[in-house]
Amino acid sequence: MTTQLEQAWELAKQRFAAVGIDVEEALRQLDRLPVSMHCWQGDDVAGFENPEGSLTGGIQSTGNYPGKARNATELRADLEQALRLIPGPKRLNLHAIYLESDTPVARDQIKPEHFKNWVEWAKANRLGLDFNPTCFSHPLSADGFTLSHPDAKIRQFWIDHCKASRRVSAYFGEQLGTPSVMNIWIPDGMKDITVDRLAPRQRLLEALDEVISEKFDPAHHIDAVESKLFGIGAESYTVGSNEFYMGYATSRQTALCLDAGHFHPTEVISDKISAAMLYVPRLLLHVSRPVRWDSDHVVLLDDETQAIASEIVRHNLFDRVHIGLDFFDASINRVAAWVIGTRNMKKALLRALLEPTDQLRQLEASGDYTARLALLEEQKSLPWQAVWEMYCQRHDTPAGSQWLDSVRAYEKEILSKRS
């Protein structure tokens, strides 16, 4: 530890102690908050089922930066490089299309054995795993419908895929000793004016009930459902709307997934957390950065990321909120994208933990909104960066932008050699 870092740390402890904050306790709390990194940033949501296939479902990964992972070995190597540069606990979020098999496997036939390499790798890297059925980029989703499809046979295919995915998720939780959160998102919707908005939602309701009919130990598996406002090619009608899934999660007591990019641009999910928590047992958050639409830009340490973290901390939701990331930028180094986004999420959590929330809550309760605003602004200038640097030091990760040197070296030695 350098003298400069030690001095900054000691001064930071004193400054935060003056406003009633124990920085050591804040760091202990931060170590209780894993962030689930999404595997699909590493290969632009291609997966291993058909890597040359088109990405569908109304989502886009734009850019052509060289060096994307082409197989599971490369993807895991890239993830390991990113993991070394991010302090504190992490998880990995997998989609079903990241299975490994010597022969083609239909999506309704996926089994735990197709993910055993991921489980062994997660054990070696002390990670929990989360999961997602992949209800897009497939011939049977080409017309824009999956679990709400009017064709019963196609609908059953997707039901069976989701049921098989739940078994994989439960396998993750059983093997790794930490529950896997399995999130269901479907692209179902219509491009133009829709006459019958009810029937697809009735079919989706019945399909989801069949999907979750098999019971699993909640210590191994947690179901989550995710809404969306619109997607490319489904601008006018989305079957799985916010109201649909809020009702479903409330009535079935599943987790509800809130994705930062899946609402109107004037809406923020930070404002939805406290409302949803009154009705659902758990929340899954997909922290992202929508630029004018669900563009899935890399997460910044911006106002909304900070507000999301503050809601979790202020209301002590550590055991009820699962933090995941969801972005995919193919225009920059993909390892760097993981590092930037995940470190920013953790920085936001740390800053929230360093807030004098009790004092602010008392001011609010007494009606002293002047002091509330003044202290909220003053605390932004407190030396949280010194606390972050100490946290990085304790986890043997670079404190500042030095991590970029490691990424550049990896790019030169490994990524640049990929065709």
From Swiss-Prot:
The keyword Metal-binding applies. One of its GO terms (biological process) is L-lyxose metabolic process. Its cofactor is Mn(2+). Pfam families: RhaA (PF06134). It comes from the Bacteria. Pathway: Carbohydrate degradation; L-rhamnose degradation; glycerone phosphate from L-rhamnose: step 1/3. One of its GO terms (cellular component) is cytoplasm. Binds 1 Mn(2+) ion per subunit. Keywords: Cytoplasm, Isomerase, Manganese, Metal-binding, Rhamnose metabolism. Its main location: cytoplasm. This is L-rhamnose isomerase. Its EC number is 5.3.1.14. InterPro entries: L-rhamnose_isomerase (IPR050337), Rhamnose_isomerase (IPR009308), Xyl_isomerase-like_sf (IPR036237). Catalyzes the interconversion of L-rhamnose and L-rhamnulose. NCBIfam families: PRK01076.1, rhaA. Belongs to the rhamnose isomerase family. GO terms for molecular function: L-rhamnose isomerase activity; manganese ion binding. It is an enzyme of class 5 (isomerase). It catalyses: L-rhamnopyranose = L-rhamnulose. Mn(2+) binds at H262, D294, D296. It is found in: Cytoplasm. Homotetramer.
